[in-house]
A protein has these predicted regions:
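Polybasic low-complexity intrinsically disordered regions
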Residues: 1-106
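Short, solvent-exposed polar/charged micro-motifs at secondary-structure junctions
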Residues: 8-14, 112-114, 155
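Hydrophobic (often cysteine-bearing) scaffold residues that line and stabilize catalytic clefts
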Residues: 64, 124, 153, 157
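C-terminal domain-tail junction helix/linker
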Residues: 154-187
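Helix-centered, glycine/charged polyanion-binding patches within enzymatic domains
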Residues: 78, 83-151
Length: 187
């Protein structure tokens, strides 16, 4: 499972005057939140159980399909992405690397796959949305309180480590990996 999320650096109206990440950050658009932003975009690779296994950080104006190439070496087999990963050249590159990229198609595209398969894709894709939602709400991964890229990547790595530790504790206790409510109640 692969998806991206925005990381705001400054409010869009203040971005031209912002000195933080000048020359590194960019302007982008997040379709799921229907907002334009100035900052970075995080790209997360999650395994089937919901445990993050890969992450890359790009300027917001970099296409998420281009950022996915940074994580291609750790992907094998089936890869589920959202509609933002639809591009024939990208799909061919994935096929050449032994990766079967499956995405939901746009409304104006013909889908030859069985409807039951598409429903399974959509149901499994919710898992990465859940993980990104947890990282955003419980770990505030979308907030930038840093002034340089090293500290930002370090901060994000710590948050991903905390998420993975919570998943590990749940697996050790015989629970679903991304159900953190029971960990909070037990503390």
């Amino acid at each position: 499972l692969i998806d991206g999320f925005p990381i705001d650096v400054a409010v869009r109206t203040r971005a031209p005057r912002s000195k933080v990440f000048k020359g590194e950050a960019g302007y982008g658009y997040c379709a799921s939140k229907n907002k334009h932003f100035y900052g970075f975009q995080g790209h997360l690779l999650v395994e089937a159980r919901g445990i993050p296994v890969g992450f890359t950080l790009t300027a917001a104006n970099i296409d998420e399909r281009d950022a996915a190439y940074d994580m291609m070496d750790i992907i094998a087999g089936l890869l589920l992405g959202d509609k933002g990963y639809i591009r024939p050249e990208f799909k061919e590159d994935c096929r050449g690397l032994g990766i079967d990229l499956q995405t939901p198609l746009r409304k104006n595209m013909k889908d030859d796959r069985p409807k039951s398969f598409v429903k399974v894709i959509m149901r499994v894709r919710r898992r990465i949305e859940t993980v990104i939602g947890q990282l955003a709400e419980q770990f505030e991964i979308e907030r930038c309180r840093c002034r340089d890229r090293w500290h930002m990547t370090s901060r994000i790595a710590r948050k991903l480590l905390a998420h993975n530790m919570g998943s590990y504790l749940n697996i050790s206790a015989g629970k679903a990996p991304i159900q953190f409510e029971s960990l909070i109640a037990a503390a």
